Design a protein with these regions (language model features):
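N-terminal metal-binding scaffold of metallo-dependent hydrolase/deaminase domains
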Residues: 1-35
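Divalent metal-coordination and catalytic microenvironments
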Residues: 9, 25, 45, 56, ...
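Active-site metal-binding motif and surrounding structural segment of the metallo-beta-lactamase
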Residues: 33-49
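Metal-associated gating/positioning segment near the N- to mid-region
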Residues: 46-111
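Divalent metal-binding segments
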Residues: 58-67, 86-98, 118-126, 142-149, ...
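Histidine/acidic residue-rich metal-binding segments in metalloenzymes
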Residues: 126-290
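His/Asp/Glu-enriched, well-ordered alpha-helical/loop segment
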Residues: 194-221, 287-289, 295-368
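C-terminal cap of metal-dependent C-N hydrolases
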Residues: 359-413
């Protein structure tokens, strides 16, 4: 007898309908035959996908919980079809000490309704060695906050950490060149035109930073994952060097003309790019990863000046439907959805029990109604953020149920 049976499931790439048997939070059977359980969910011929994984969220907890916390952030994740998230280390305090990492693990364990993993911030070699006792999935480096000299030291220490501990050598990098951003920002920081923010952090700063980061990673025998790629040239550099990367929905669907419509509501780092250099839906391939960079702020923080307002866009509750709409438009293959929203992130971040619907994997699932139509309404979102450039956009296709470790955490079936 199974703890849970999910019946009448369509699986991407397979014909017919399947029944999935779950026991002890694991997938134990995948069959077209009838199987028994006292707990049966009939998903009515909708698509069953491996639970979505977002490798890039900012849940602001601890220290910045006016913007978001692990409860509201994880509820937003579940609402958006995500069973697993990876949280970033730029909280208060920064998650770059053993004590801070331990504190965040404890509070997330109490608040989160989805699976969570944590990235750690860099520190001294001794402190990072202590942090490895808590198994962060990777270390995050904000290239735009560091000088070239400090970056050399940071990557050297990460290389030493890999040689002396269980650290797998994965570095997640925010790639913008500090010197270029500083120079261009000084030229434009008096501007009141939001579009100038994109020129203050030009695509060349990302392109050059990606090159530098690849060199530093290779020099120190580290694996590299590039966050929120926004420049087409930077994407080509990453692909040429076989480097993993992620796209955000806003960089794929908006260019910098959106600043004329939404103002600082679409301010983000890296910024939205001019149409001739930005990444697009057509750039998604079977190795791509979607990372939302879900980065909520208060309205007050978003409504300040062009250069004083806070950068960041909430995205967990819109991304799946935005991509499924592109599927329905014929701009994106349905077969790519479980790869870019689950399988590829599980591979890169070594979440070995996740990312696929297969016997022995964790019972994390996202149910997709490919024909569900609606209009985004920020007032119905779980996030604390009260803004989104996609508020009011119509969509076709939506996550209608999220299951985490065999338990339903969101149900709109």
């Amino acid at each position: 007898m199974f703890d849970l049976v999910i019946k009448n499931s369509r699986l991407v790439g397979k014909s017919g309908e399947y029944n999935i048997g779950v026991k002890d939070k694991k997938i134990r059977e995948i069959t077209k035959k009838s199987i028994k359980s006292e707990n049966i969910i009939d998903i009515k011929s909708n698509y069953l996908m491996p639970g979505f994984i977002d490798p890039h969220v900012h849940f602001r907890d601890p220290g910045l919980t006016r913007k978001e916390d692990f409860r509201t952030g994880s509820e937003a994740a579940a609402h958006g079809g995500f069973a697993t998230v990876i949280d970033m280390p730029n909280t208060l305090p920064k998650t770059n000490t053993y004590d801070a990492l331990k504190e965040k693990m404890n509070l997330a364990s109490k608040k989160s309704v989805v699976n969570f993993y944590l990235q750690a911030g860099h520190n001294s070699l001794d402190e990072m060695t202590r942090m490895m006792e808590l198994n962060p999935v990777s270390f995050k480096v904000f290239m735009d906050l560091e000088t070239d000299e400090s970056l050399e030291e940071i990557f050297k220490n990460l290389g030493k950490l890999k040689d002396s501990t269980s650290y797998n050598g994965l570095v997640a990098a925010h790639c913008e060149k500090r010197s270029i951003v500083s120079e261009k920002t000084q030229e434009l920081e008096e501007s009141n035109d939001p579009i100038d923010y994109s020129y203050a952090r030009p695509h060349i700063s990302e392109d050059e930073s990606v090159k530098q980061t690849i060199e530093l990673a290779r020099k120190n025998n580290l694996r590299l994952h590039i966050c929120h790629l926004s420049s087409k040239n930077a994407l080509n550099i990453a692909r040429k060097n076989n480097i993993s990367y992620e796209f955000t929905p806003h960089h794929l669907l908006l260019d910098n003309s959106a600043y004329n419509t939404y103002g600082t509501m679409v301010k983000t780092n890296p910024p939205l790019r001019p149409k001739d250099v930005c990444v697009k839906i057509s750039d998604i391939d079977e190795n791509s990863i979607i990372g939302t960079d879900h980065a909520p702020h208060t309205l007050e923080e978003k409504q300040k000046g062009v250069f004083t307002s806070s950068p960041g866009i909430p995205a967990l509750e819109t991304v799946a439907s935005l991509l499924l709409t592109e599927v329905n438009k014929g701009n994106l293959s349905l077969e790519l959805i479980p790869k870019i929203l689950s399988k590829n992130a599980a591979r890169v971040f070594e979440l070995e029990s996740k990312g696929e619907i297969a016997v022995g994997k964790d019972a994390d699932f996202t149910v997709i109604d490919l024909k569900r139509k609606g209009k985004f309404d920020i007032s119905t979102f779980k996030t604390k953020a009260e803004y989104s450039p996609f508020d009011g956009w119509e969509y076709e296709g939506a996550p209608v149920m999220t299951i985490v470790n065999g338990s339903v955490v969101f149900d709109d079936l």
